[in-house]
Amino acid sequence: MKNKCLLLLLFASFPIFSWADETLDSLLHVLDQAILAHDTYVVQRESRIRHLKELAGDVAPNSIERYNLNNQIYKEYKAFICDSAIYYLNENVRIAGNLGDTDREIESKLQLSLLLSSTGMYTESIDVLKSVDRQKVTSHLILDYYTCFDHVYGEMGFYTQDQTLSAYYREISSAYKDSLYAILSPQSEEFMVMRETLFRDRHKYDEALEINDRRLMAAEPDTPQYALVTYHRS
């Protein structure tokens, strides 16, 4: 889990230089530079976290203000210390429950599920999803809801050594992908990422690269988004 968190930190925290048609060696070179600067960015992130915690300590423990500050702390931690990110999401689930705020409770559960599946905690991720009442998922969270199911079952299908289970998990993931395609705009980043991944998995590299070119044109250089798009080219 620590290795996955380190990769998240590298993409979330460090400036990435332009290398639209460079090789994987170029990406590794940039990551090496990021690792060398790691201590500096850790100090900066820890400073932001301390400040947010100080602010959180000055507001009521069961309040929207505390929820929002916890959410900011979670975002700082999620690419830094995953265990702490999980803790603050669970705190927000508790706060939202105490407030009777179903929408925010579901929002935090979906964030938690995605974080858990991104760090290999698939059983825990599915348990969280099972605790979400589909009938209470509002329209602005339905995309996140489908994404969580698609992601966790897609990851399980990829990493399991059992081919029968792999096919089963991939079938579930594919069903949620279909649901996502039905509600996403073809011009959206999420839609294009899914199509690019599909083409790449089917070894249709020209089609995948064409979509990646469009994503790269829309991404601002020296940002985490630009880094992710260029990473997908390697």
Task: Briefly describe each language-model feature range.
Residues M1-C5, W19:
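Short, Lys/Arg-enriched, disordered terminal segments
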Residues K4-F14:
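Sec-dependent N-terminal signal peptides
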Residues P15-S234:
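A "functional boundary" signal
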